[in-house]
Amino acid sequence: MSKSLKRVRRALEDAGLAVEILEMAEGTRTAADAASAAGCEIDQIVKSIIFRGEADGRAVLFLTAGGNQVDAAKASALAGEALGKADAALIRAQTGFAIGGVAPIGHLSPIRAFFDPRLMDFDKIWAAAGTPRHVFAAEPHEILQISGAEVADFTA
């Protein structure tokens, strides 16, 4: 089991959530791939979109419904600074995850996070579990709570 997957499992256990982490043979690098593999609507997939703060260089995480896009201006306003593209090295260094497997929890460093209200419309949502092939399902309020994210409007 990878270190990334272990960190997510530990974060779930520490939060008292008894959820199953599933390995998807087809991979879940995109929201469409994940929805197909999980047998759910695309908006039930939690996309982890990371930007880099231009002022401090720190990662800012936007947890959005799979069919939504992050509006850069709204995201920057929420973050209180201009946001730029986060490269794979920054994402790996600050979260410990590779692109395509960024979980909403279990990051190497604390991360400021925002949560798409669209995700609250479902009984269950699916998120990456630390690798591009692993996912877990939980209730939206559970992921919101354990991620420490703030519900906010940042989509286009």
Language model features with spans:
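Extended, low-hydrophobicity, polar/charged segments
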Residues: 1-156
